[in-house]
Swiss-Prot record:
Its main location: cytoplasm. Belongs to the peptidase T1A family. It comes from the Eukaryota. Component of the 20S core complex of the 26S proteasome. The 26S proteasome is composed of a core protease (CP), known as the 20S proteasome, capped at one or both ends by the 19S regulatory particle (RP/PA700). The 20S proteasome core is composed of 28 subunits that are arranged in four stacked rings, resulting in a barrel-shaped structure. The two end rings are each formed by seven alpha subunits, and the two central rings are each formed by seven beta subunits. The catalytic chamber with the active sites is on the inside of the barrel. It is found in: Cytoplasm; Nucleus. This is Proteasome subunit alpha type-2-B. GO terms for biological process: ubiquitin-dependent protein catabolic process.
Length: 235
């Protein structure tokens, strides 16, 4: 018997030891638009493709990079509606922590709480796993941090990572370009060059998004004008 007959059951392991619905969720991530993150010596940058379904869509209404707290931001590959649900849950968790302890939630703690939510959706009846992987960028007392969270609920800290349909090219490029002493501006240039690998069409401020956080511990999404400036620098 193969794994196929188990593919509709979330809570039953297949004979090969897989939860097939999680495999399908990872397929949804793998067919999503490319996103990446780079941890620099003095900050973190996350970036993503933003391909719109039609030229009639107002690009300003599509935001793939979101704040979770003033010093933590996130981006996804996979299903946008699932991302919205996780963003809402993560923000609520951060607000509860702030109310209870009167200090901002540490990056690791928020990542762990978000991963716990995702893991719970892999062992409950009547639900399905989230069809997204997240890259979470933050800066707290422990310095700059970058985490990736997958549909299974597993999470790891990364120096640089990528996900989505162009993941193999992007990771190969990052492995060649990444250095421990990379500054934030250099990381932004590297992020743009990584997105260019396998990018269909011409890259512009209308079809990519970039978020960054530095030593000021304020996460922000770059404006189209700022992205244009960085694009001009890497030409």
């Amino acid at each position: 018997m193969g794994d196929s007959q188990y593919s509709f059951s979330l809570t039953t392991f297949s004979p090969s030891g897989k939860l097939v619905q999680i495999e399908h969720a990872l397929t949804a991530v793998g067919s999503g638009q490319t996103s990446l993150g780079i941890k620099a010596s003095n900050g973190v940058v996350i970036a993503t493709e933003k391909k719109l379904p039609s030229i009639l869509v107002d690009e300003a209404s599509v935001q793939k990079i979101q704040h979770l707290t003033p010093n933590i931001g996130t981006v996804y590959s996979g299903m946008g509606p699932d991302f919205r649900v996780l963003v809402r849950k993560s923000r609520k968790q951060a607000e509860q922590y702030l109310r209870l302890y009167k200090e901002p939630i540490p990056v690791t703690q928020l990542v762990r709480e978000t991963a716990t939510v995702m893991q719970e959706f892999t062992q409950s009846g009547g639900v399905r796993p989230f069809g997204v992987s997240l890259l979470v960028a933050g800066y707290d007392d422990k310095g700059p941090q970058l985490y990736q969270v997958d549909p299974s609920g597993s999470y790891f800290s990364w120096k640089a990572s990528a996900m989505g349909k162009n993941v193999s090219n992007a990771k190969t490029f990052l492995e060649k370009r990444y250095t421990e002493d990379m500054e934030l501006d250099d990381a932004i240039h590297t992020a743009i060059l990584t997105l260019k690998e396998g990018f269909e069409g011409e890259i512009s401020s209308k079809n990519i998004e970039i978020g960054k956080i530095g030593t000021d511990k304020v996460f922000r999404v770059l404006t189209p004008a700022e992205i244009d400036d960085y694009l001009a620098e890497v030409e």
